[in-house]
UniProtKB/Swiss-Prot annotation:
Cofactor: Fe(2+)
Cofactor binding description: Binds 1 Fe(2+) ion per subunit.
Entry protein name: tRNA N6-adenosine threonylcarbamoyltransferase
Function: Required for the formation of a threonylcarbamoyl group on adenosine at position 37 (t(6)A37) in tRNAs that read codons beginning with adenine. Is involved in the transfer of the threonylcarbamoyl moiety of threonylcarbamoyl-AMP (TC-AMP) to the N6 group of A37, together with TsaE and TsaB. TsaD likely plays a direct catalytic role in this reaction.
GO (cellular component) term, any one: cytoplasm
Subcellular location as annotated: Cytoplasm
Record keyword Transferase present: yes
GO molecular function terms listed in the Swiss-Prot or TrEMBL record: iron ion binding; N(6)-L-threonylcarbamoyladenine synthase activity
InterPro entries xref list: ATPase_NBD (IPR043129), Gcp-like_dom (IPR000905), KAE1/TsaD (IPR017861), TsaD (IPR022450)
Keyword tags: Acyltransferase, Cytoplasm, Iron, Metal-binding, Transferase, tRNA processing
Record's catalysed reaction(s): L-threonylcarbamoyladenylate + adenosine(37) in tRNA = N(6)-L-threonylcarbamoyladenosine(37) in tRNA + AMP + H(+)
Length: 340
């Protein structure tokens, strides 16, 4: 095998169009991201059809910019990695079809990547010496998982949400208290002005041995609290609501992840996904893990949000295991972690 494996990666699962050039799964030469946040902000959330159209408008330019920034041409690329699920089906198809076209035209192998595996692999970019096994908490707008990474490309899901993802709950609560979209960063910001002990919202876990989560209950509790306040004509302290809600979510994320770590006897927790940028989650996880002698690994914000560099990293580890993807592959919007 060549000393350096160069992956061109494409990500379009939701509202970011991204392309990157990644060497050997850990070195990023370029990571171009065209965000649609301003486009969807006025709608209060991502509109799937609008997202797909925006991907179509910019994908060619984004891929070319990624190659140019890396000072590469397609001749320098060994394989093309692309997200094929989970995500919005229309958005996924834009990136997938573009990648398939490139693979067909150049004769380069295609490697389909699970978006969640991509989030986990973002840690290999930031932490060059990181190797499995370790625990990973994946928290984003559409996904919440506690994952035991046994080996490269080998996962065991120990806990997951049974309804809303953590990021989805953040967005819905932010909308309810008039903060707008995207909810996660706005709740994080206003929470710093609030009292996290002001309101006792329920914790988002189950009273059994499972490490699963349920965020629909806490979301409903917040909405009920707001409705009662409005019916009584009482003032609503948005900062207190945001801080109390955030604490109830973060506490169960941290507690369950530490329990998972102890059960598998691993001393590293890697965090992935957009909600990993939340300052309360970061601070609480680091503080509580320090008490248990567990190291916490959190990539920078650019690698926590959806980006193609993480897809390039995951594609590399698939490539060296000899895995290739047929050009007949289709988008799988509900793809499960570990499925191929």
């Amino acid at each position: 095998m060549k000393e350096s494996i160069n992956i061109l990666a494409i990500e379009s699962s939701c509202d970011e169009t991204s392309a990157a050039v990644v060497i050997n799964g850990r070195e990023v030469l370029s990571n171009i991201i065209a965000s649609q946040i301003s486009t969807h902000e006025k709608f209060g959330g991502v509109v799937p059809e609008v997202a797909s159209r925006k991907h179509i408008e910019v994908i060619s330019a984004v891929v070319q910019e990624a190659l140019d920034e890396a000072n590469f041409t397609l001749d320098d690329i060994d394989a093309i990695g692309v997200t094929y699920g989970p995500g919005l089906v229309g958005a996924l198809l834009v990136g997938l079809q573009y990648a398939k076209g490139l693979a067909f035209a150049t004769g380069k192998p295609l490697i389909g990547v699970n978006h969640i595996e991509g989030h986990i692999s973002a840690n290999f970019i930031e932490y060059k010496d990181l190797k499995p096994p370790f625990m990973c908490l994946v928290v984003s707008g559409g996904h919440t998982f506690i994952v035991y990474m046994k080996d490269y490309g080998e996962f065991e899901v120990l806990g997951e949400t049974r309804d809303d993802a953590a990021g989805e709950a953040f967005d819905k609560v932010a909308r309810a208290i008039g903060l707008g979209y995207p909810g996660g960063p706005k709740i994080d910001k206003i929470s710093k002005e609030g009292n996290e002990e002001a309101i006792k919202f329920p914790r988002a876990n189950f009273h059994d041995d499972t490490l699963d989560f349920s965020f629909s209950g806490i979301k409903s509790a917040v909405l009920n609290y707001l409705n009662k306040k409005e019916m009584k004509g009482e003032e609503i302290n948005r900062a207190d609501v945001a801080a109390s809600f955030q604490k109830s979510v973060v506490d169960v994320l941290v507690d369950n992840t530490i329990k998972a770590c102890m059960s598998k006897k691993v001393d590293k927790i890697a965090v992935a996904g957009g909600v990993a940028a939340n300052s309360c989650l970061r601070e609480t996880l680091v503080r509580e893990c320090k008490k248990k002698g567990i190291e916490v690994l959190i990539p920078p914000f650019i690698l926590c949000t959806d980006n193609a560099a993480m897809i390039g990293s995951a594609a590399y580890f698939e490539y060296i295991k000899g895995r290739r993807t047929s050009l007949d592959i289709n988008a799988v919007p509900n793809l499960k972690l570990g499925e191929r």
